[in-house]
Amino acid sequence: MNTALAQQIANEGGVEAWMIAQQHKSLLRFLTCGSVDDGKSTLIGRLLHDTRQIYEDQLSSLHNDSKRHGTQGEKLDLALLVDGLQAEREQGITIDVAYRYFSTEKRKFIIADTPGHEQYTRNMATGASTCELAILLIDARKGVLDQTRRHSFISTLLGIKHLVVAINKMDLVDYSEETFTRIREDYLTFAGQLPGNLDIRFVPLSALEGDNVASQSESMPWYSGPTLLEVLETVEIQRVVDAQPMRFPVQYVNRPNLDFRGYAGTLASGRVEVGQRVKVLPSGVESNVARIVTFDGDREEAFAGEAITLVLTDEIDISRGDLLLAADEALPAVQSASVDVVWMAEQPLSPGQSYDIKIAGKKTRARVDGIHYQVDINNLTQREVENLPLNGIGLVDLTFDEPLVLDRYQQNPVTGGLIFIDRLSNVTVGAGMVHEPVSQATAAPSEFSAFELELNALVRRHFPHWGARDLLGDK
């Protein structure tokens, strides 16, 4: 057993007491991102090493792996703790998203180590989608690069409000305060272009040497701020969903016998209590909450993020994908929306194409009406394009086959986040964040049906010699 873990269990008074203490710790999900070879995997390895989360057999294996694949000479290559794929170890880069778990006396953590290469943008977006904080690594020798800007933009696009700019490899610039100050000013100048009210913090460190990672550095007396671990342990996460209105997407209708009918799911935002009047969308039927059933028994109220089963006073028609919200809230269903899209497939996203989409348990079909622009994620400029390529990010107009209840992604990631699914292969080909739902009054009517538009796109793609015109060419 890990000696540090054994000591923690002893201090808590046994395994059972230790497990109870773990359950009551807050959880922080964060990701590390930055340019290639900025030291992301090394930083995570250092956090695991310095918080004594590595077992003795892992440490022994790390010594052997460092001799075979290491890039740090005689020193331990801590990056190998995270780079698990054979291709990653041989190339010395991160390809896939690697998740690691550790805890301290104050908090539990889930780390997503995301790739820095531009061709793995889709992997980074996947890792960022569930995180609350992003650590942006910058090589002190190189300063703010295009990839730094790209990762910052993707993080904020996916709703991350807390950014920790870790200026790494300070040991290679002689722990220069001037270098730290210059990079800090450069990043703040760029950050003015990022959307939202962001919490940005700066920490100078050396992941290889351990300076300012888990303990204060003696080599940088000019820095009096917290270490990276102290920032992670003390940052107060802004949970946007707590302040938002109630949203309860139904994931499953639970009917184990004739006497019980409940609607299971995770409360996406707000709170719900017994006796509350609720409305079911898109039908608009109303009822009252009779019971809130959980694994630990009935509750009088529940809050955002909790998995619950709601029992209503009336027997009404509710199925998977329906949405429950407060009865006095007017939230219209829409059939069109502008959506920020991260495209993840080799086949580009083009106007006229149709895809299956899933959003908050609901599955339907959507047609691409047009592409407003693609974002150049290296300098955040916008340019007109005919299609959205692999790893491209852009603003797209969608029309759905049926009315949907949507929120803006920045307000509610559950009811504002969707995925695109290829209808033939059933593969996820893109991720979308609702930029703005379009009400029926403002949606432009189409003179063509969804079938006609899809057939037109099919003919133009496979039979270009027929010379068929683009029915959406005016968009």
UniProtKB/Swiss-Prot annotation:
Residues 168-171 are annotated as: G4. It catalyses: sulfate + ATP + H(+) = adenosine 5'-phosphosulfate + diphosphate. Residues 34-41 are annotated as: G1. GO terms for biological process: hydrogen sulfide biosynthetic process; sulfate assimilation. Residues 206-208 are annotated as: G5. PROSITE patterns: G_TR_1 (PS00301), G_TR_2 (PS51722). Pathway: Sulfur metabolism; hydrogen sulfide biosynthesis; sulfite from sulfate: step 1/3. This is Sulfate adenylyltransferase subunit 1.
